[in-house]
Structures are given as structure tokens and as C-alpha cells.
Amino acid sequence: MTRANWFKAAAALAVAGIVVVYLYDPPWIGGVTSGLRGWEQDPPGTFFRWTTGRATFFVPSNATSMTVPLRAVFPGPDGTPVKVELRDDDRLLTTIELTDPDAWVRTTVPLKRGGRRRFRRIDLKISRVVGPFYLGVMTGEVVMR
């Protein structure tokens, strides 16, 4: 291999390393969501987003707790509660049962100490969705402390 080829290979490896380091903890990930529809407003003026069967959003890693408002408009068969599993970076935080379709349930959960990343991933797994639009539960504005 010639000296020029060694230089090109070293430059390509350096660029690849920089990209990997950048994508390990990207600064823009805090605004990324998955499984959540756009913001809507119900008649009393509460802002919310519909989930699908699974939803993901990111919160700052220095947050010590968060309050997640949830509402299940479509109860399960025979009025069974809709269950929402909350996870923090794949670690189970809690399972919330939503029994009243007319009530917002605001659950505050503690978060573990932040790691080396700027943001942590919060996952919601909803036990029941209603077709044809795969609507899960209504999720309000999450408050972090």
C-alpha cells in the first residue's frame, strides 16, 4: 500500500470514529419521538398526543423524576383497565392501570441517576390499541424535575 493510500485510510478511519462518537450521544435526540401523533387539544384545553401500541420519547439525563399524564379513552373488553408499562432505558419503572376513561392519571416516577449521555429513552407499552388508526392512550405534557 502506498503512502497516499495509508493517508486516505487513516483519514477515513478518523472520520468514522468522529461520526460514531457524535452519534453515541447526539444533541438533537431530545426532540425525537416515535409512536406519538401530533399535538391536539381537547375541549377543556388540555394538550395531548395519541400513542400507538408503543411510544418513545427522550428526557434529559439530569432529571430526577417525571410526571406522565395518561388517559385511556377506550377501555378494554368488559371495562378492563388499559395497562401502560413505563421503561427508562429498558429498565421497568412502573405499570399504570387506567380504569376511568374520563380521568387523567398523573403518575410521578423517580428516575435513576443520569449516566454519561445527555438524554435517556422513555418507552411506553400500551396493552390495548383501537383500530383502524391504532390509537392507544392520550399522553399529556410530561413534566420533569
Label each PLM-derived region with a short phrase:
Residues 3-10, 17-145:
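C-terminal luminal/periplasmic domains and tails of membrane-associated envelope-modifying transferases
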